[in-house]
Amino acid sequence: MVVQVGINGFGRIGRIVLRATESNKDVQVVAINDPFIPLDYMVYMLKYDTVHGRFDGSVEAKDGKLVVNGHAIAVSAERDPTSIPWGSAGADYVVESTGVFTTTEAASAHLKGGAKKVIISAPSADAPMFVCGVNLEAYKSEYKVISNASCTTNCLAPLAKVINDNFGIADGLMTTVHATTATQKTVDGPSHKDWRGGRAAAANIIPSSTGAAKAVGKVIPALNGKLTGMAFRVPTPDVSVVDLTVNLSKGASYDEIKQAIKKASETTMKGVLGYTSDAVVSSDFVGEVCSSVFDAAAGIQLTPTFVKLIAWYDNEYGYSNRVVDLLVHAAKVDGAL
């Protein structure tokens, strides 16, 4: 069996989700909706990518459809999610990647068009949130709308889980040094809710808020209220890095901490949490499929209970692969695979 998938919003995440499905035998994209990108432009945007390079396959427009590696994908341009013909295209699972319909009520509009389940590729205020490697066991088939949380939560939560399970986290602060995203400005412009966020992305390091650390408490209840954090937006096109500084409940040497993370990366969190001791920099992680790669050589320890841990993530590619993994997990639990 193959899960038939629809994508609403053909932006950074939507396009990379499609790329990720091309190497996953359990998933096939059958429909894409985007009111702002006509078919010929979809071909161009999928084929060429400044960060991730040219698409490794064939892409063309034919008979009003997007044809990827010989497979025809229905295309629509509806602004109202209730009007998207998911049912007629056979799309049972829909990836909601516009960044607009992020609540259960808003995302549920896709169900009216024939979708059976919606995966939001963003944090949600009220939809159940899941992070691969952390809390997938909490998923229930009765959920019609679920969230894959944020790219930063996907990086932070696996690392936090390993540390908390082995040593306990009394409390901690996170900083993500985050690559530029599409919502930022190329030159100074109006941004009424976030004045700093309106400054030129390529010319500034911009302090910003993030709910990623607090969201860890939603997927790891034992850490609820124990973590918070902030972001610095920096002038790089992709790949971000988490700096997690924690007070441990149980003292440990840095070697013991590294060993616990390495063990998890090779067993329970293989494919989600990576491990490296090389002298790496951000560009080394473009195209990284893990949610989080622990940088063993970059962390520092002050006392046995006070430590700074560093983890890299491709905020586009790794996250998009987890969207697909979450979808596949849901489909298996639902009996669709």
From Swiss-Prot:
Coiled coil: none
Enzyme category, top tier: oxidoreductase
Residues of the active site: C151 (nucleophile)
Sequence positions that bind NAD(+): R12, I13, D34, R79, N315
EC number: 1.2.1.12
Chain residues that bind D-glyceraldehyde 3-phosphate: S150, C151, T152, T181, T210, G211, R233
Any GO BP annotation: glucose metabolic process
Induction line: Highly expressed under anaerobic growth conditions in the presence of glucose and the expression is highly regulated in response to carbon source and/or anaerobiosis.
Protein name: Glyceraldehyde-3-phosphate dehydrogenase 1
Organism: Mucor circinelloides f. lusitanicus
